């Protein structure tokens, strides 16, 4: 009996019916207004360009200041089919190893069908793409998690999925590539010969190892040049953070179940969707004075934009197809 009680407190599992019915948008609770995307001083309008290649539902969510955005019922069903709600585990052995009096918990986003949190927004974006009558979606991927997630989600909606994968990682991870292809994704090493951006780079350097910025440019160009395709992005933007809030909303319910309140929340941070999805529902309550909690982001030393980047307007891709976005940047 005692062992069962300990297990119940160490594996905090929500029922499928406890899945949150709405996503959370932290913009509703932040003081002031964030700097808006803007066009550069010369050249064509990037803001107008994005309106042609991004999904309409996602663009609406991108600028929304509504606190709660209902999760469409079919997306809720897809979340449940993909294993949501995800468990929260207590790390007792790590506590003993560290000799700490702290209680340590970790959220199991790794239990998704593709192994990461990326599925949370991929399922939503693929659903919206199907609702808007798209034939397919295009995107980029770095480590490969986002490309895999979108290929999986697109397959559930009967959509084609074109993925431009940073060449150095494409060559490094053939098994991950095979998984994308298993879900029906068509994967190109980036820079590729499928786009003018890629061809231009390869003409100058046939052995170019690629970058995420180049892959973003290729994904955007593919959606622009191929009717019926929309471009999907797996991190960075507001609508992605909204979809990922499902992580933090579940986590908040799970801590309520065991009458605990986290005082420190730690997450890895690349583009920010994992960290943001995890902490923003809690951060919104901190802003409103309803809770006390510290938030720590752990970032790779190879891309330390938060600690070494400059906070300024910059493009989000190599070919300067995106609007100028206010960010901590090491350059595009």
Protein language model features and the residues they cover:
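Active-site-proximal loop->helix
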Residues: 146-209, 306-318
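Short coil/turn connectors at secondary-structure junctions
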Residues: 100-102, 133-135, 157-161, 182-185, ...
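General beta-strand structural signal in soluble alpha/beta enzymes
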Residues: 104-108, 138-139, 188-190, 231-235, ...
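Active-site/ligand-binding loops adjacent to catalytic centers
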Residues: 71, 85, 201-239, 247, ...
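A short, small-residue-rich loop immediately preceding and capping a beta-strand
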Residues: 121, 129-168, 261-275, 295-296
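Positively charged, low-complexity intrinsically disordered leader regions
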Residues: 2-134
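A glycine-rich, Thr/Ser-enriched phosphate-binding loop motif common to dinucleotide/cofactor-binding enzymes
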Residues: 113-124, 235-250
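Phosphate/pyrophosphate-binding loops at sites that engage ATP/ADP/AMP, CoA/4′-phosphopantetheine
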Residues: 253-260
